[in-house]
Amino acid sequence: MENAPEKENTIPQLYAGAPPVRGARRIVFAPWALLEPAEGRANAEAVEAVREALIRCIARGGQPVLCLYAGEDPAWFTAKGGWLMEDNLRCFLRYVGRAARAFGHLTDEYVTFFEPNELVWKKSANRNLNLRFKMLSHMACAHVRAVKLVRDTRAQRQLEETRIGFVLRMYPAIDLRRELLRGDNAATASAYEILPLLAMARGDFLPPLRNTLRIRPGKWADFIAVSGGGDEKKRRYCCRAAATLTETEIWEVMDDREDR
C-alpha cells in the first residue's frame, strides 16, 4: 500500500490468539482437513472439538468468530487438484454449508478465508504465476459463494443475521518490495493485496483475476480483517490504507501465536 490517510481511527480488533480482555472477538479455527477427512464424510470427533472450542470462548466472555479456512486442505481435495480446479469449489461449499449448520447456533460471525493472498503468494508450492492467479481467483469466487450460502442457511434456520468477512495479509509497500516481490514471489503489490481485496469485498474481479463463477458486483463482506504481523504501527497503517479502497468495515487482527 503506497498511501494511507493520516487520521487515526478506533479499529475493532480480532484476536487469533488468546484475547487479553473479556468481550473481545476471538477466531476459532475450523480445520477442514480434520472435519472432512474423507470426501463427503464428517468426522464427529473433530466437529465436537470445534463446538467445544466455541463454547469455551463464550464461557470465558469472548465473542467467537468461526474461521472456515486457513490453508488446511484435506488430502482428498489436494488429490483432485485442489484450488486449481473450478469444479472443486463445490467441495469447499459443501463443507461450508455443513459448518454453518453445525455451528451456527454458537456464533453469528464468520471468517471465510484467513490470509488467502499469503497462502497463494508465499506458502504455495506452485511457482507458476498464471496458476497462482487461478488459485486466487477460485478462492475469491469461493468466498463470495460462501458468504451467500452462510447467509441463506442462517435465514432458513431463523438465526440472527450474520457478519461475515475475510482476513487479508497486508504490508507497507516498502516491505513488499524488499521481501515478497522478489524471486519466486514476483507479483506486484496490487496482485498481492488490492486485487483479492476488491474481488472478495465487492465482486470486482480485475485482470488477471478471472470471475469464473460470474459473481455479481455487490457487498460480499461485512468486514475485512487486516493482519500484518507484530508491528502495531505497520499494521495500523495497512488498516487505514485498506479503508481507502472500500467502504467495508476494517478490523485489525491481533496474532500473538508463534511466528508463522
Regions picked out by a protein language model, each given a short descriptive name:
Residues T246:
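Conserved nucleotide-binding/hydrolysis modules and their immediate coupling elements
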